[in-house]
Amino acid sequence: LFQSGALWSSMTVGENVALPMQMFTRLEPTVIRQMVELKLGLVGMLHAIDQYPSELSGGMRKRAGLARAISLDPDILFFDEPSAGLDPITSARLDELILNLRDGLGATIIIVSHELSSLFHIADDGIFLDADQKTAIAHGSPTWLRDNCTDPVVHAFMHREQLDSSGPHGDG
């Protein structure tokens, strides 16, 4: 799932969700329509089946993109910054939706995220990637990474909220 939802703007939400099924299955149009309704229902977007992406809020576009992402019942779902650009309440709802889909579909979820609250809520395990070193520099649960990892880059990332609240010089 892309940050923006990556929906085709000239297609309705329903058409966007149907597209992978039309391209990669031999399902009859009536079955595809039923599957589209099911997938949109799973993400709470059935009411928007005939709307265009431009008519949706950012959070709704992400949920519609998620419905399309699960249209073929994948074993693995990839999310790129799923809560980027969302307010905290919508972000928390999206986190819950991701967890519900993971549990309901039995899919493996891989998330790239800088949102600590989402990581602690969703992730069982984390791998910390360092762009400068172009390698994985730490691995463990979010709690372990926060409380036990001695790598200075990981420590700074996992404790940045404390740094942000105290100001750049720790003077509060």
Question: Could you say what each language-model-derived stretch is?
Answer:
Residues 71-75:
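A short, proline-enriched helix->beta-strand linker immediately N-terminal to the Walker B motif
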Residues 77-80:
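Catalytic Walker B motif of ABC-type/P-loop ATPase nucleotide-binding domains
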Residues 92-104:
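Helical segment within the ABC ATPase nucleotide-binding domain
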Residues 132-157:
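Conserved beta-strand-loop-alpha-helix hinge in the C-terminal portion
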